């Protein structure tokens, strides 16, 4: 009943700054994303943001706790571990951050102690594995395995919407263990965390997270880090602002802890804290505490990196335009090539397209020099799982390079500190430049570094972003990586908008890969068809099972629906047609329909704003012709 529905979580709301993003040209898309990303630092709606004194106090206390655990490893030879965990994007950020922090420890002669977990294991770094995300006991089991033999474990569970059952199971386990510190990171008030029943479990996310919140008031082994940074620019797409905020918060806490341990500044200009506050001291105003200055300075570095990226909005828009000119083609592809952390970020961005926009596995790809070797992932080389997991440059050369056409866009990702990059990358790039593919260059440049060696007139578009900050501890490209994430998110999101996979700021062809996305699909159908919740769900089931009479499927567990739907494309658009009054639809021919959202019809890449026509009460329609009055599946 609509009157009894709870308020929607902030992370599931529509961002008012981007509600017309589907009508924008490439530069307009980037400018709207700039406004949304500003909320990461400015906060949203009167809630505490990342710069709020209450959040800063929690971050500082967590940093002190972390530094103490790291110090015990150094001085007392203890086996303390720090474990980051999450589903989808959160798990991928957990992987990248643990890899980065371990390399910093190794550089200074310390034993790595950072670990990560991702629901579904390492295969989920490339392809979402739906059912483990909704399995709390599996989450607890995975945590027990990684904690085995440790003296103390700091567990950091990341769930942007406070909605992941996998993480809830881990928090439920960790907060009842005497040798564990429990940290929950997300971007909703705890009171709005997900409260839906979970299959084969007797608790909800909200029950677990409220218990942790209560515990955090009295214990130094429980933390909740939940600044409110506003709705995503594409509704519910936590890979964007949620993922970026996660990277900022993890960096702020754990780089500061490493600075304390190592006695080395994160940046040459950053001083060490003058003192540590007493255990009983509570700091609510960072301007009064010299101890907080390195952490505040670090947040300022991230903020300045964000500002620098969007001062290059024109360049980012030019790369977006280049990518969209290929993605909007029938067989177009966008391919990222890079090395080290920057290459891995291309891998991550490409991996997020299937669940978010329902694209094919080959439409967005990422390749990194050296492949899985040296990527710091737990399971090592994943190439044996299939073509999609073959991510080295050698595998690009054998699998993809021979098939490149003028409908493909290859984007080369460089850091200026890499000089010419790995020799193989230079060789591969030259071969790509000689191919029919459209080739772009994106350079994250370190101040004072010449980039002339990277430039080549054969690139159709080349963009250089010179950053005020680049490395952390003189080695890891933390700030360059944050900048690159913002740019890649803009490029891939913009390309999908121009392809017609977004209406307003809603992703209308999401892949139903977990419980949360199943719920989101029902909400989208309700919103755009005018149907009530019950009818919207029934239309969704009809679309999943391809039967007009879906009554037999109504009482199956949601996991059954997800298993059936996770490999299907265009389920939500089909359900929209059904919920909107289309009583007769040819299910067998639905795969032939080309995704075109009416308001972005014609793929306005060159800056021509389309003229939206009145669309009636149901909006996103999959057309087989260009005539607005033709609905055909």
Where are these regions (language model features)?
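Conserved N-terminal alpha-helical segment that immediately precedes and caps sugar-phosphate-binding
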Residues: 1-633
């Amino acid at each position: 009943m609509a009157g009894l529905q709870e308020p929607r979580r902030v992370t599931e709301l529509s961002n008012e700054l981007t509600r017309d993003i589907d009508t924008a040209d490439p530069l307009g898309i980037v400018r709207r994303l700039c406004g949304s990303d500003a909320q990461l630092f400015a906060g949203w709606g009167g809630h505490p943001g990342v710069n709020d004194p209450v959040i800063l106090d929690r971050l500082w206390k967590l940093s002190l706790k972390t530094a103490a655990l790291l110090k015990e490893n150094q001085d007392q030879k203890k086996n303390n571990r720090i474990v980051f965990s999450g589903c989808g994007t959160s798990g991928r950020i957990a992987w990248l951050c643990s890899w980065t922090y371990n390399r910093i420890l190794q550089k200074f002669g310390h034993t790595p102690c950072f670990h990560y977990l991702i629901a579904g294991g390492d295969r989920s770094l490339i392809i979402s594995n739906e059912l483990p995300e909704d399995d709390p006991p599996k989450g607890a089991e995975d945590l027990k395995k990684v904690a085995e033999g440790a003296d103390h474990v700091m567990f950091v569970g990341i769930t942007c919407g406070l909605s992941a059952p996998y993480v809830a199971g881990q928090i439920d386990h960790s907060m009842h263990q005497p040798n564990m510190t429990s940290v929950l990171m997300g971007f909703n008030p705890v009171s709005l965390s997900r409260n839906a029943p979970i299959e084969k479990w007797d608790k909800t996310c909200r029950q677990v997270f409220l218990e942790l919140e209560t515990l955090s008031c009295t214990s130094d082994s429980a933390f909740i880090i939940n600044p409110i940074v506003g709705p995503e620019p594409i509704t519910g797409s936590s890979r964007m602002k949620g993922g970026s905020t996660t990277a900022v918060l993890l960096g702020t806490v754990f780089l500061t802890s490493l600075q304390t341990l190592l006695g080395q500044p994160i940046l040459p200009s950053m001083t060490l804290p003058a003192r540590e506050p007493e255990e009983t001291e509570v700091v609510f105003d960072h301007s009064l505490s010299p101890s907080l200055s390195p952490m505040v300075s670090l947040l300022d570095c991230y903020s300045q990196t964000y500002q620098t990226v969007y001062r290059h909005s024109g360049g980012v828009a030019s790369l977006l335009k280049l990518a969209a000119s290929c993605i909007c083609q029938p067989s177009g592809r966008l391919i990222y090539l890079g090395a080290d952390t920057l290459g891995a970020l291309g891998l991550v961005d490409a991996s997020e397209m299937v669940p978010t926009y329902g694209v094919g596995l080959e439409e967005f790809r990422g390749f990194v020099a050296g492949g899985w070797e040296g990527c710091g992932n737990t399971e090592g080389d994943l190439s044996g799982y299939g073509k999609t997991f073959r991510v080295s440059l050698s595998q690009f050369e054998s699998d993809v390079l021979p098939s490149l056409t003028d409908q493909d866009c290859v984007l080369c990702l460089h850091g200026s500190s890499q000089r010419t990059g790995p020799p193989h990358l230079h060789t591969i790039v030259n071969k790509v430049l000689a191919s029919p593919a459209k080739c772009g260059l994106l350079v994250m440049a370190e101040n004072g570094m010449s980039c002339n060696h990277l430039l080549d007139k054969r690139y159709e578009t080349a963009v250089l972003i010179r950053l005020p900050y680049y490395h952390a501890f003189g080695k890891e490209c933390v700030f360059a990586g944050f900048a690159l994430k913002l740019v890649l998110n803009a490029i891939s999101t913009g390309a999908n908008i121009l392809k017609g996979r977004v209406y307003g700021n809603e992703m209308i062809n999401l892949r139903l890969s977990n419980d949360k996305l199943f719920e989101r699909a029902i909400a989208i159908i309700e919103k755009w068809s005018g149907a009530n919740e019950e009818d919207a769900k029934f239309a969704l089931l009809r679309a999943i099972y391809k039967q007009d009479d879906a009554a037999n499927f109504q009482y199956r567990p949601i996991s059954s629906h997800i298993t059936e739907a996770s490999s299907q494309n265009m389920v939500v658009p089909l359900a929209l047609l059904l919920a909107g009054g289309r009583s007769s639809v040819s299910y067998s021919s639905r795969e032939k329909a080309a995704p075109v959202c009416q308001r972005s019809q014609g793929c306005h890449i060159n800056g021509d704003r389309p003229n939206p026509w009145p669309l009636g009460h149901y909006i996103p329609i999959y057309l087989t012709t260009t005539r607005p009055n033709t609905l055909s599946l």
